[in-house]
């Protein structure tokens, strides 16, 4: 019997102000763990899989039940340790310490590969936490929509004179991360054609309004895109097809999109990418019989797709890797020039990271959407001079369906995160918000990740693979008084290719929370400015000086 599979489970986080734990500082991680497994949030909640191939919230259902049980009894001066989704210890600490410390899928570097991890996983000794799956702060596809929107907008500025009108994007994958692409693309003014092999994922994105139309015909999909471009009304199309097949077919036809990228779960060739000419059922069967054959076939198909991406780039398409490590997989399969198209971070996002700007997010523990709308208004009030941010908040309210507990993602940086959090805390204190909020971020942030094929690709000083930075980030956030802190390996790009840390903190309206919020949400983004200043980025050095960061080795 698979201890990770239970189709009878239907997890819904409690709403409102009634506590089932001893304080909001333990109620919050409990609700957020449960929210990660909400049927409208998780990809396969019956298997504890939240997103990203096999990114889980807990190691198995026995561990999940025990985590909930412990959180409900945890005292305000105790800390729960969670090792790869398993609650392994409760220790006496102090009231300002994190209530939960999480470490997921960390392996000694020599053994940090999928083969060794999969052996441990089979024995029930490990769990792949992805980024926000195992750290209990996943908010559905909204969590990546704004970052994707900002990237597509930056591509329009860089490649199309600032206008995306009449332009279209070709991409793959409609899972938990990839599902953001069609909505982000149309919000940025493009039409979007997304290939997906799992029809249930297309249907889910249709239901939540992330995708406009669905077809299983490439000809029909291209006709939809063409009609939308002529009418000036962007459309997103979910095409039931294998991305490798479609990308190669477009090269064959001489059809060149304006933008090409991909967000299939290529980081995990065993569980995340369907080889060409395979059905989902056959792949599931083969994973049990011959894992090596699945990996080989998946990588061969990735090589086909990447060769097509390179050909489309040569034909004039703006082509970028969107952080799933597909270039690395193709390179290992013999595509020597796989890295000839850039990753999205060095190409479009790094200047934001230099100012500590990244995917700040918050969740209304009340379950009341009005609490989020009130915080949206507060963000506009406190940041009045950022029309792009205001536009994002307006579009998000209009077009993004909440998944599970209501939440918001908002890319802000060092100068704004702490003051926004303190304002939210005051709103809880005054009763303007009906219950506390949790504030966190993706692990994809400026100071919390080392990932040479994604966030830290092509660093100015060559420090791409130095992972001291996320370790220091996690330790500093623990010392600063976050509510829960996580340290993971392999998120986004797969085992052996990244280390990263997460942080979440509760705003419960108390004066004590205000002190912790001010510390954590200043120190956390400040480590990103520090990391980029240390690497030699002038924008980061300027930001550090303007914000009076004490960086001993930075020239005054």
UniProtKB/Swiss-Prot annotation:
It is an enzyme of class 4 (lyase). It is found in: Cytoplasm. It catalyses: 4-imidazolone-5-propanoate = trans-urocanate + H2O. GO terms for molecular function: urocanate hydratase activity. Its cofactor is NAD(+). GO terms for cellular component: cytoplasm. The keyword NAD applies. NAD(+) binds at residues 52-53, 130, 176-178, 196, 201, 242-243, 263-267, 273-274, 322, 492. Binds 1 NAD(+) per subunit. Keywords: Cytoplasm, Histidine metabolism, Lyase, NAD. Its main location: cytoplasm. GO terms for biological process: L-histidine catabolic process to glutamate and formamide; L-histidine catabolic process to glutamate and formate. It holds the Pfam family Urocanase_N. Pathway: Amino-acid degradation; L-histidine degradation into L-glutamate; N-formimidoyl-L-glutamate from L-histidine: step 2/3. The active site is at 410. Belongs to the urocanase family. HAMAP family: HutU. Catalyzes the conversion of urocanate to 4-imidazolone-5-propionate. This is Urocanate hydratase. The gene is hutU.
